[in-house]
């Protein structure tokens, strides 16, 4: 029988070789066709007496990237249809049966009575890695870039094809929990040390090694199916188990504040499953998986962190009639920390980079920063010396603007000062080649006004990076009023080249990300001035799902920079454009107390020298508060809601103001740009899943109690009255082919 996604061959020794190769895809995924065909293959190889064993591998560079999450999203749509037509019991049964399909196929492999070997030739994640765990032997091809793991938790799910049951039956409970709850990918060496891989061999010997294991009489029985099998960490109710699970629950609560149902389900699956035979344990896993699959958190995270992000990365916002840019060489003007980092990630992406500053010494310092980054990667084993040398070889440091003459794209990353930027543009324009695109990395100054200093405003655009550039995945592309399609296409092509996720926004003060995150920081200041204890402010924010508290974030941004932005805004727009009480607080901290934030080791927090303890809130902070509220009288849930609502309502305003024109970008941008509670799916999904009517009611309540910053825009009032959602009213367009 011919298959679409697999090739099945049997050699003279009776060993079947299954080669996975989905046509038209760069990676194999577990989709509907793969399920049907793999199920058929398992049945055929099991029934064929001539087949002595089975090897499964991939024809692509990677083994399998995991489940096709759009298939899982489709299961939820089917659930809603069956729920409407046949009721809850029928819908639940349908979802349970469909969602455990791969789990059942893998169990059929495992109990086929014939030895199965996974010949892992590259990346194996999620359901792809679970497939290998159901094989009786796992052999991997040597490759320092290969990663194995179960990242489902990152999109609000958990491994539902046996991962929560097989992993803790192979490795120690603590290691199993780390793998399942963190979703981090393992190197081959780490996987082998944990016994998740049995052997690592040269790539040329991979299939031979897999077949040799079968020929040598490899067992066709999983360890947990053998009589007398003992769990690596002992029974759940043993001394070790009792040390593990109560502590694990405490750690889970500390890390997630119970915002992620999938994490709780993992704990339950492992705890309950390890007390049962494997078949019953797999049914337990499947029941929890079906429950989590229909949770709003999973729906929101799958949509934003997988589907939307994938569409944006593929060029959903790219003008279709502009040919590919074919970037080869770029320049970064300003070799400070930000500019040097932009230069590094560009060189890492394979581009030639000219790093320019006011003098050679400053330019060399920028290149030295890039050198320190690659040296760190080599030291950690995350890059080979040859790769590091190649990256550094692509960076040229200079003070000579004439080096711009053959650059396709120039990114300005100089000081946030209009005069300095204008001088830079005047120098640069003398040397730009025809058709070169010019971008500013400004984080605060409107692009349209900056473009006035540029001759051809159609070639001027904003490319806003987030710090630290090496780690932050988001890039905000800002369209000035005159920015043309070629500039936009070039910027998007550039962001794709350096492996980051773009969002495209229209020009306004603060653009999108800073508009929202400044509301978060300001709400922290507001609570501080209300008399909420500083520790309570920080903890409530983290409980709401934010990665760091607003006071800590202020320190990271730099208090003196925050004050400078306030003063610039006041100068441009007048005294009513800023909160004067907040300015007074910043003046006290920065100008009177000399506290600039992490940069000088003192801000809202005190920062000890490296290696000498953790940061702690400045003991004298309370003296700067005009009053002090009793923490026992404060509603923590309301504090949490204030942090999320104030950011979400600002995001809604950016839609009304046409700063955001694609709802996906608000959600993806808010999570990647400033860590807005990922379990919500982002700022607009937070509103949609709460319901616009309920959200507007909450806004009115907070407006009456705390002020106009919570007032919903007219657009949101209108949507609430009609029962609309953002994704319903503004359905996103699909990515360009």
Which residue ranges define each predicted feature?
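N-terminal glycine-rich phosphate-binding loop for ADP-containing cofactors
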Residues: 4, 11, 21, 72-79, ...
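Short, active-site-adjacent cap segments at secondary-structure transitions
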Residues: 61-65, 125-126, 445-446
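Structural motif
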Residues: 15-19, 37, 55-57, 117-119, ...
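Gly/Ser-rich catalytic serine loop of serine hydrolases
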Residues: 118-128
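Conserved catalytic cysteine-centered active-site region
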Residues: 105-118
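Amphipathic alpha-helical interaction surfaces in cytosolic regulatory modules
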Residues: 33, 47, 60-77, 106
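Conserved CoA-thioester-binding segment of acyl-CoA-metabolizing enzymes
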Residues: 1-57
């Amino acid at each position: 029988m011919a298959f679409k996604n697999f090739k099945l061959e049997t050699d003279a020794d009776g060993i079947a070789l299954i080669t996975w190769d989905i046509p038209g895809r760069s990676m194999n995924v577990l989709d509907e066709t793969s399920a049907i065909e793999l199920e058929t293959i398992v049945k055929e190889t099991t029934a064929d007496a001539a087949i002595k064993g089975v090897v499964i591998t991939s024809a692509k560079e990677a083994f399998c990237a995991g489940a096709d999450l759009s298939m899982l999203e489709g299961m939820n749509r089917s659930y809603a249809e069956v729920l409407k037509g046949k009721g809850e019991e029928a819908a639940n049964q349908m979802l349970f049966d469909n969602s455990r399909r791969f789990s059942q196929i893998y169990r059929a492999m495992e109990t086929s009575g014939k030895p199965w070997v996974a010949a892992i030739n590259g990346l194996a994640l999620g359901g792809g890695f679970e497939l290998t765990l159901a094989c009786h032997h796992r052999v991997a091809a040597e490759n320092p870039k290969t990663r194995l793991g179960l990242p489902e938790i990152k999109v609000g799910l958990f491994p539902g094809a046996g991962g929560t049951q097989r992993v803790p039956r192979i490795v120690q409970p603590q290691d199993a929990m780390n793998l399942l709850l963190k979703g981090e990918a393992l190197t081959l060496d780490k996987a082998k040390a944990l016994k998740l891989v049995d052997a690592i061999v040269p790539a040329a010997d991979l299939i031979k090694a897999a077949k040799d294991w079968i020929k040598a009489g490899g067992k066709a029985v999983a360890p947990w199916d053998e009589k007398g099998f003992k769990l690596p960490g002992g029974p759940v109710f043993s001394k070790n188990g009792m040390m593990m699970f109560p502590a694990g629950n405490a750690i889970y609560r500390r890390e997630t504040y119970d915002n992620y149902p999938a994490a709780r389900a993992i704990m339950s699956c492992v705890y309950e499953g390890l007390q049962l035979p494997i078949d019953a344990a797999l049914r337990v896993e499947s029941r929890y998986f079906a429950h989590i699959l229909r949770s709003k958190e999973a729906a929101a995270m799958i949509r934003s962190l997988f589907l939307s992000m994938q569409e944006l990365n593929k060029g959903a916002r790219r003008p279709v009639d502009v040919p590919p840019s074919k970037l080869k060489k770029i320049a970064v003007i300003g070799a400070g920390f930000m500019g040097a980092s932009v230069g590094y990630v560009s060189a890492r992406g394979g581009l030639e980079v000219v790093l320019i500053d006011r003098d050679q010494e400053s330019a060399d310092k920028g290149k030295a920063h890039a050198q320190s980054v690659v040296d760190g990667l080599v030291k950690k084993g995350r890059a080979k010396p040859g790769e590091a040398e190649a990256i550094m070889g692509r960076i040229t440091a200079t003070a000579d603007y004439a080096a711009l003459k053959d650059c396709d794209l120039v990114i300005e990353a100089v000081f946030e000062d209009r005069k300095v930027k204008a001088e830079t543009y005047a120098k640069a324009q003398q040397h730009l080649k025809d058709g070169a695109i010019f971008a500013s990395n400004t984080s605060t100054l409107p692009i349209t006004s900056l473009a006035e200093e540029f001759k051809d405003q159609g070639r001027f655009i904003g490319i806003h990076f987030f710090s630290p550039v090496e780690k932050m995945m988001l890039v905000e592309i800002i369209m000035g009023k005159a920015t043309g399609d070629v500039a936009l296409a070039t910027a998007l092509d550039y962001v794709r080249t350096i492996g980051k996720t773009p969002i495209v926004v229209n020009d306004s003060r603060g653009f999108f990300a800073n508009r929202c995150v400044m509301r978060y920081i300001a709400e922290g200041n507001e609570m501080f001035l209300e008399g909420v204890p500083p520790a309570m402010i920080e903890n409530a924010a983290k409980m709401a799902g934010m990665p760091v508290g607003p006071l800590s974030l202020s320190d990271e941004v730099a208090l003196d920079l925050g004050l400078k932005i306030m003063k610039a805004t006041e100068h441009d727009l007048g005294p009513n454009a800023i909160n004067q009480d907040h300015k007074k607080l910043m003046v006290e901290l920065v100008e009177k107390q000399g506290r600039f934030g992490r940069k000088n080791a003192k801000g809202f927090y005190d920062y000890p020298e490296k290696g000498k303890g953790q940061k702690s809130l400045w003991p004298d902070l309370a003296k700067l508060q005009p009053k002090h509220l009793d923490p026992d009288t404060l509603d923590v849930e309301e504090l949490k809601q204030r942090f999320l609502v104030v950011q979400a309502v600002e995001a809604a305003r950016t839609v009304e103001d046409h700063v955001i024109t694609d709802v996906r970008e608000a959600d993806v941008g808010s999570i990647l740009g400033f860590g807005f509670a990922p379990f919500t799916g982002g700022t607009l999904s937070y509103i949609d899943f709460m319901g616009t009517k309920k959200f507007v009611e909450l806004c009115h309540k907070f407006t009456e109690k705390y002020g106009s910053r919570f007032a919903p825009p007219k657009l949101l009032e209108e949507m609430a009255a009609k029962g609309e959602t953002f994704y319903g009213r503004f359905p996103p367009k699909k990515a360009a082919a």
